[in-house]
UniProtKB/Swiss-Prot annotation:
This is Fasciclin-like arabinogalactan protein 2. Induction: Down-regulated by abscisic acid (ABA). InterPro entries: FAS1_dom_sf, FAS1_domain, Plant_FLA. It is found in: Cell membrane. The keyword Isomerase does not apply. It is a lipid-anchor; GPI-anchor. Glycans are attached at N28, N130, N164, N248.
């Protein structure tokens, strides 16, 4: 029995190590800033603009925090929440700068990308921040788009976790004409126009042909997440789409929208079933969001689609590109669950037999065999990975037992 105790001890140690490694890489900017009330306004707007979610998602980040007094300078200008998001995204650097690194900048000056730059919101290099080590040990910051004026200086370090996250207090808000520029209000965000400009014209066309575009557009103000299949995926699916009834066509299109804004970080942290625009009464029309590392997949029980990237992120609207058309089980479940009808002792007329055996108008055809094969392959791969993990654990346990 001693070897069993050793094996159990090894398993506990492995679990604790895994838990420690997971927690050691995590950070929460909201909790970090909540420790100092001087940053309460800055902290509030990081959450309100969902920048906090993006900060927590990244493994290497620097936040240039400003106190309540400095924040009042931009709030008094009456900027919209979307403008404030752009301005604050200049304060999030996608590289690590601790106090030590600030004073060891090569040649005394450098420029680094902010989140305003890395997310594609900025044009050219207008989202870069200039950092300069001035004589006397002072460090100054300025937006490259603002004639590289050094408008703020380093005050103190708030929190540092080397090479993961650094929170530095700076004296003034960093801003620029481009960041302050008015952004489109939700009612100005025309979804079909956005889709057509972002390589989703085929999906935009079926939105309009079914009349579902109005439902999507009417939902934008309250929050909308759209999963847009690529043009090639829609093109491959069109023969089956054309065979659907009008009601099922509309339901399938609505199935690609969620009536809530969900950033990529929210999707990654919220595994489970989600409702869609097609959800109504007993018709669930939901699918499951699953995460595997950095990858996000959408599982419908009929097909699994992968999120390929973000096409548009302007709260309250976000649009993702996916690699497959989402097929709801409410439309295709008959194909998955139906069994052959019992043979009748009476012979049927030839034409009736043909009608009974023929595929239904809404049934998937050849491609659905491929979907089934894909699922079997995924299960096989999962079994293989599980087997490898078990083998590794057994090996470790055996090693501990031998000690």
């Amino acid at each position: 029995m001693a070897y069993l105790r050793r094996a159990a001890t090894a398993l506990v140690l492995i679990f604790q190590l895994h838990l420690f490694l997971s927690l050691s890489n995590a950070h929460n900017i909201t909790r970090i800033l909540a420790k100092d009330p001087d940053f309460s306004t800055f902290n509030h707007y990081l959450s309100a603009t969902h920048l906090a979610d993006e900060i927590n998602r990244r493994q290497t980040i620097t936040v240039l925090a400003v106190d309540n007094s400095a924040m009042s300078s931009i709030l008094s200008n009456g900027y919209s929440l979307y403008q404030i998001r752009n301005i604050l995204s200049l304060h999030v650097l996608v590289d690590y700068f601790g106090t030590k690194k600030l004073h060891q900048i090569t040649d005394g000056s450098t420029s680094t990308a902010s989140m305003f730059q890395s997310t594609g919101s900025a044009t050219g290099t207008s989202g870069y921040i200039n950092i300069t080590d001035i004589k006397g040990g002072k460090v100054a910051f300025g937006v490259q788009d603002d004639d590289s004026k050094l408008t703020a200086h380093y005050v103190k370090s708030v929190f540092e976790k080397p090479y993961n996250i650094s929170v530095l207090h700076i004296s003034q808000v960093l801003t620029s004409p481009e960041a302050e520029a008015p952004t489109a209000s939700p009612s100005d965000l025309i979804l079909t126009t956005i889709l057509e400009k972002q390589g989703c014209k085929a999906f935009s066309d079926i939105l309009k042909s079914t009349g579902a575009d109005k439902t999507f557009q009417d939902t934008v103000d309250g929050g909308l997440t759209v999963f847009c299949p690529s043009d090639s995926a829609v093109g491959k699916f069109m023969p089956k789409f054309k065979s659907l009834s009008p009601a099922n066509k509309t339901a399938l299109v609505l199935y690609h929208g969620m009536p809530v804004y969900q950033s990529l970080q929210m999707l990654r942290s919220g595994n489970g079933a989600v409702n869609t625009l097609a959800t109504e009464g007993n018709n669930k029309f939901d699918f499951t969001v699953q995460n595997d590392g950095e990858d996000v997949t959408l599982e419908t029980d009929v097909v699994t689609a992968k999120v390929m990237g973000t096409l548009k992120d302007q709260e309250p609207l976000i649009v993702y590109k996916i690699d497959k058309v989402l097929l709801p089980r409410e439309i295709y479940k008959a194909v998955k669950t139906s069994a052959p009808a019992p043979k009748s002792s009476k012979k049927k007329p030839k034409n009736a037999e043909a009608d009974a055996d023929g595929p239904s108008a809404d049934a998937p055809s050849d491609d659905d065999v491929e979907v089934a094969d894909d699922k079997n392959g995924a299960v096989s791969a999962m079994i293989t990975r599980t087997s490898n993990v078990v083998t590794a654990i057994v090996g470790l346990c055996f090693g501990v037992w031998l000690m």
